Amino acid sequence: MVLYKDGKIYLKIVYWGMGASGKSTILKTLYRITKESKKDIIPIGELQIIEKASGATLYFDRGLFQSTKQKKVYYRVYTVAGQRGFTPLRKKIFDKTDDQTDAVIFVVDSRTNFLEDNVESLLELKNIANDRLLKEIPMIVMLNKQDLDDVIDEEDFKLILKDEKLWYEPENKLYIWNPLIYTSCALYDQKKDIYRSFHETARRAVLYHVYGEGKAPTEMDISQKTQ
């Protein structure tokens, strides 16, 4: 989070995932939704898209959005290039010293034949986040391309999250921050859960800072500060 003297707050949200999982398409669809419909979050300016002729992200995509209810709250939104050779750039975008990541949307290519590639991308994210996922950085999962055949379902991916210790059991105080898993389609004409997933991520990013001072707040933390 970056707080300026004029009271404006900038939160950074990163779409992360393997190459061709649909991150750029999601951002473009989110931009259209928030520009064309009355939503709690609106785009500011145009998207910055840096891509190859094939449409694959070359370095990153970036957009700026603003809360309509809390007008001094802004969201800097990035997508990262998912190809293996861009690991150093992904790390730089995620961990930029003066603008560190406040929340992550992990985008899964839901086709079952890409399961290992998705897990590899998740492991890289875990490593770069250095054990901060969920504890300090909220994460949402989008099982994208659900309009295709032979896709991963929610329970399959929940098992992966449990294996990677990115899922809390009910007795843990941070159970309320388990990643919500959305089954999505990024294509504008078939869009599903594009805005909902972003809105929830933005909500969690704010709650972590307001009630947890940059960490996952417990229900007691929230209760004490709302009394």
Feature names for model-found ranges:
Residues 1-50:
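Conserved G1/Walker A P-loop phosphate-binding module
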Residues 20, 83-84, 111-113, 145-149, ...:
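Conserved nucleotide-binding/hydrolysis micro-motifs of P-loop NTPases
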Residues 55-58, 66-71, 93-100, 131-135:
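Conserved catalytic network of the ASCE P-loop NTPase/AAA+ motor domain
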Residues 71-90:
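Switch II (G3) loop of P-loop NTPases
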Residues 77-79, 104-109, 141-144, 183-184:
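Conserved beta-strand segments of the P-loop GTPase G domain that flank and frequently precede/overlap
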Residues 87-113:
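Inter-motif core of Ras-like GTPase G domains
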Residues 110-174:
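Conserved C-terminal guanine-recognition region of P-loop GTPase G domains, centered on the G4
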Residues 149-213:
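Canonical P-loop GTPase G-domain recognition
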